[in-house]
């Protein structure tokens, strides 16, 4: 009788999972960075993970006179330019900030939230596919200049100060990304 019951329930559960997987609201919403779209990321989860980590890390960021994500970097970014800029910033955060901050996060015991944030940044970045078309060259150059402004400021700081500052500004990055988030 148990085998018969399992055989009846299993197809029903499979169907329910299949249907739930097709409902966009349950998968996460969508980022639309100009021509680049990313689905399956739930922005509130990113915010929650960030605040969990930042509440611990914030005490480390004592340099309030410098801002890495300046208005010149993030304001008035065209939709087309947003794909390139988001890709560059997320790649930098993953390869530089998160990579070098990992050991501190382990000490602070917020690895789960940090991993949620890093893994979602990786998913978003890997799905962003900026066009390599020559017609897009002026747009990609503009995004590159914005990123270099950020990167130069980062490089001018002591590495530990720069890492704390960059991590402390993830909320600025998330707020900017939220402008491209579709429900």
From Swiss-Prot:
Homology family: Belongs to the IL-10 family.
Domain of life of the organism encoding this protein: Eukaryota
Subcellular compartments: Secreted
Signal sequence, start to end: 1-28
Origin species: Rattus norvegicus (Rat)
Function: Multifunctional cytokine mainly produced by T-cells that plays a regulatory role in immune response, tissue homeostasis, host defense, and oncogenesis. Possesses antiviral functions and induces the type I interferon response during influenza infection. Signals through two receptor complexes IL20RA/IL20RB or IL20RB/IL22RA1. In turn, stimulates the JAK1-STAT3 and MAPK pathways and promotes the secretion of pro-inflammatory mediators including IL8 and MMP1. Intracellularly, maintains endoplasmic reticulum homeostasis by restricting the eIF2alpha-CHOP pathway-mediated stress signal.
Keyword entries, A-Z: Apoptosis, Cytokine, Disulfide bond, Glycoprotein, Isopeptide bond, Secreted, Signal, Ubl conjugation
Positions of crosslink type Glycyl lysine isopeptide (Lys-Gly) (interchain with G-Cter in ubiquitin): 99
Post-translational modification: Glycosylated.
Record gene name: Il24
Protein name, entry field: Interleukin-24
């Amino acid at each position: 009788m148990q085998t018969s019951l399992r055989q009846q329930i299993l197809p029903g559960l499979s169907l329910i999972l299949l249907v739930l997987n097709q409902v966009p609201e349950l998968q996460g919403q969508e980022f639309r960075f100009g021509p680049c779209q990313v689905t399956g990321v739930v922005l509130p989860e990113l915010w929650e993970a960030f605040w969990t980590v930042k509440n611990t890390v914030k005490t480390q960021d004592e340099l309030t006179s410098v801002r890495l994500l300046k208005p010149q970097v993030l304001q008035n970014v065209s939709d087309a330019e947003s794909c390139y800029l988001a890709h560059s910033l997320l790649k930098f955060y993953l390869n530089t900030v998160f990579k070098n901050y990992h050991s501190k996060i382990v000490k602070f015991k917020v690895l789960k939230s940090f991993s949620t944030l890093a893994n979602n940044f990786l998913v978003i970045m890997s799905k962003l596919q900026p066009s390599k078309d020559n017609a897009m060259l002026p747009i990609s150059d503009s995004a590159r200049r914005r990123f270099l402004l950020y990167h130069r400021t980062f490089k001018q700081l002591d590495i530990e100060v720069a890492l704390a500052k960059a991590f402390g500004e993830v909320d600025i990055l998330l707020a900017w990304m939220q402008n491209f988030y579709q429900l």
